Structure formats: structure tokens, C-alpha cells
């Protein structure tokens, strides 16, 4: 997934979930943050950030903040929209299934809507995609805040399995160099427990890291998934 018109800046502060103040070429700019999550471990004052300049002159903000250079970690893409786009490209390119497949984004099934629907002569599968930006001690974790929506998605994937479909949770880790993925038990234990239930029900739990550069992000290598809970 490629970006265009990339600019470097320095993060100053974040008044709310949607905007941040960034110094660009000596000027303080109000920019759009493409992630409404907390991202406190990423958006530290003085951190080098990368932004995409909008081609829409009517926008209130001229830039989107998409990537940060985290100390001792390197580049992390924090754009919450890019995991789905990268996953669509990746699946279409044949990286997940050996046969040729047809991929449909945003597919509705019953009362649910899944990020990707994949079909071929061999399979019918739903894929839910989650972007992961939280990392500590070389462990990627999700979620960074309680997510009832995430729990709902997992239960819907279990239901799809019961109806005869294949079901996948694809965790797109928006960085390189992590050792493994774990649920963020301390932040939302119910999500971790539901993830364990989904695994037992046959849902495929996959995690992949990404090649991240200021102007692109591509899904790359598999990452071990650890669902055991040592947190009480």
C-alpha cells in the first residue's frame, strides 16, 4: 500500500482524538490523525512523524499523520485505514490461499459485515482484519483500549464457522521486529477470552508483521500468536 506526497515533521501535542499539532518546516500545523485510538506510547512530544499531504484544497487540515518513528523501535504505521487495504492487496496477490480466489471487501452476511469475503471452488471464507500498533518488550498486543466491537466480531466469526464457512482473524502488526502477538489481557480480558474461544471453535488466528517505510506499508512475515493468559 503506497502513499503519495510524504512530509516529515515533529509531533507537538494532540488536543483531541482527531487532530494533532505538528511542526513542519518550522511551522506549527494542525493535522488529521488517522487513528482515533489512544496511541499514547506513539505520540510523544518531539517524536519524528511522517504525514501525507491531502490533494483536497477544501479540507480543513492539509495533512494526515500516518507514521511515527518510535524510539528504540523504528517506524510504526498508525493509519487505522491501511490494514484493510494492505490485507486486500495481500490476499489478492495469493499470499494466504494457494488457489486463485475472488476477494470482496466489506461483505455483509446476516447482521454482520466482514472486512473481506474470499471464495473459490475450494472455499468460502470470511476474514476480519485488525490493525495492531501497540508494542512493548517486543510483544505486539491488541487492543489498546476496551473494544466491545472487537468481541462482537470474534463471536460473529465463530457463528460463520458453525454455518460452514472458513473464518479468519488477520492481525496486521504495523511494524517490524516483534517476537510474538498476545491479547492485551490487562486492558480487555473479555477480548482475550473470546479470542481463545474462537481458536477452539476453529477460527484461524493469524498475525503478520509489516514492512513499514514513510511512504508505504506491506504485509510481510508471520508472527507467533500466544493466547495463554498469565495475567490475573
What are these regions, as identified by a protein language model?
Residues 9, 114-144, 157:
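Conserved catalytic cores of phosphodiester-cleaving nucleases, focusing on short active-site segments
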Residues 174-232:
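Domain-level recognition of nuclease-like catalytic cores that cleave nucleotide substrates
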Residues 57-73:
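OB-fold/S1-family single-stranded nucleic acid-binding modules
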Residues 27-41:
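Beta-strand/loop nucleic-acid-binding surfaces
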Residues 45-56, 209:
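Flexible glycine-rich surface loops and low-complexity tracts that mediate binding to linear polymers
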Residues 138-148, 158-187, 209:
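Nucleic-acid nuclease catalytic cores
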Residues 40, 73-103:
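Acidic-basic catalytic patches of nuclease active cores, encompassing PD-(D/E)XK
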Residues 16-21:
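Short aromatic-glycine-enriched beta-strand elements
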Amino acid at each position: 500500500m503506497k502513499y503519495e506526497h510524504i512530509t516529515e515533521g515533529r509531533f507537538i501535542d494532540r488536543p483531541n482524538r482527531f487532530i494533532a499539532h505538528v511542526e513542519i518546516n518550522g511551522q506549527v500545523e494542525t493535522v488529521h490523525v488517522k487513528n482515533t485510538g489512544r496511541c499514547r506510547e506513539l505520540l510523544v512530544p518531539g517524536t519524528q512523524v511522517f504525514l501525507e499531504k491531502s490533494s483536497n484544497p477544501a479540507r480543513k487540515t492539509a495533512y494526515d499523520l500516518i507514521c511515527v518513528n518510535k524510539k528504540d523501535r523504528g517506524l510504526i504505521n498508525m493509519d487505522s485505514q491501511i490494514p484493510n487495504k494492505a490485507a486486500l492487496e495481500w490476499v489478492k496477490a495469493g499470499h494466504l490461499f494457494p488457489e486463485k480466489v475472488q476477494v470482496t471487501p466489506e461483505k455483509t452476511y446476516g447482521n454482520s459485515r466482514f472486512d473481506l469475503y474470499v471464495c473459490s471452488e475450494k472455499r468460502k471464507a470470511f476474514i476480519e482484519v485488525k490493525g495492531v500498533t501497540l508494542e512493548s518488550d517486543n510483544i505486539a498486543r491488541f487492543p489498546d483500549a476496551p473494544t466491545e466491537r472487537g468481541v462482537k466480531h470474534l463471536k460473529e466469526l465463530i457463528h460463520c464457522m458453525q454455518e460452514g464457512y472458513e473464518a479468519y482473524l488477520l492481525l496486521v502488526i504495523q511494524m517490524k521486529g516483534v517476537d510474538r502477538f498476545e491479547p492485551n489481557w490487562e486492558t480487555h480480558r473479555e477480548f482475550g477470552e473470546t479470542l481463545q474461544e474462537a481458536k477452539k471453535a476453529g477460527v484461524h488466528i493469524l498475525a503478520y508483521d509489516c514492512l513499514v517505510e514513510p511512504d508505504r506499508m506491506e504485509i510481510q512475515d508471520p508472527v507467533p500468536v500466544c493466547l495463554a493468559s498469565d495475567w490475573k
